[in-house]
């Protein structure tokens, strides 16, 4: 494992314990091993990540495409009511094939473990998840909902239709065994944040959080500052 201070080691151990209890990982003895990386979050806490760069370098790329964001947003043009859903730890809801689990082994200060569910950081994780969610919602996608990875938006031209559309999507997800992060779900809204934009009936705006940094940036005064602006 990479060198880490007491705070980082504690954060690492806490996350390992959490994943063990959730059935996401298990102890492992493997010829594969990737190091843990703890990435600082804006709030000062640490995000647990595994550095899979070596594994990704020898992984054959899955070319399954992600949806075009502009096409997703354009499809919402006539809608007047929206609901957004967030899959609970989305990638973890995809089980790993037994033959591939050892490849995900990571070494930490708490020992070596392998994933039983698909972890973040794998080269093909986005394509794998997108394919799975597209198959699950194939009968509803582009008709009542749009899906970009674990972000789902349900859209309708009337509140009456929206009741039915929300029920169809939630029932389909439940039948597929997928769970949602309720605190990040929003229902029956006239304006929602989706893919970095605020979606309203007949209006589209860039989300404030995506323009704040540009608005607060100081104007460059030298050639060097201009190049990095």
Give the role of each language-model region.
Residues 1-229:
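Retroelement reverse transcriptase polymerase core
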């Amino acid at each position: 494992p990479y060198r880490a201070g007491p705070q980082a080691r504690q954060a690492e151990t806490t996350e390992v314990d959490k994943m063990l209890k959730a059935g996401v990982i298990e102890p492992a003895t493997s010829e594969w091993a990737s190091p843990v990386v703890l990435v600082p979050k804006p709030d000062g806490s640490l995000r647990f990540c595994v550095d899979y760069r070596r594994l990704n370098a020898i992984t054959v790329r899955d070319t399954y495409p992600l949806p075009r964001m502009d096409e997703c947003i354009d499809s919402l043009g006539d809608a007047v009511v929206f609901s957004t859903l967030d899959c609970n730890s989305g990638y973890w809801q995809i089980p790993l094939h037994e033959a591939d689990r050892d490849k995900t082994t990571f070494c930490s200060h708490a020992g070596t473990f392998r994933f039983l569910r698909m972890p973040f950081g794998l080269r093909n994780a986005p394509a794998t998840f997108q394919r799975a969610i597209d198959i699950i919602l194939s009968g509803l996608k582009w008709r009542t909902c749009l899906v970009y990875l674990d972000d789902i938006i349900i859209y309708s031209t009337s509140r009456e239709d929206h009741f039915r559309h929300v029920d169809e999507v939630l029932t389909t997800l439940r039948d597929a065994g997928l769970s949602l992060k309720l605190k990040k779900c929003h229902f029956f809204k006239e304006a929602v944040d989706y893919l970095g934009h605020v979606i309203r009936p007949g209006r589209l705006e860039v989300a404030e959080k995506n323009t704040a940094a540009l608005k607060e940036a100081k104007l460059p005064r030298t050639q060097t500052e201009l190049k990095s602006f």
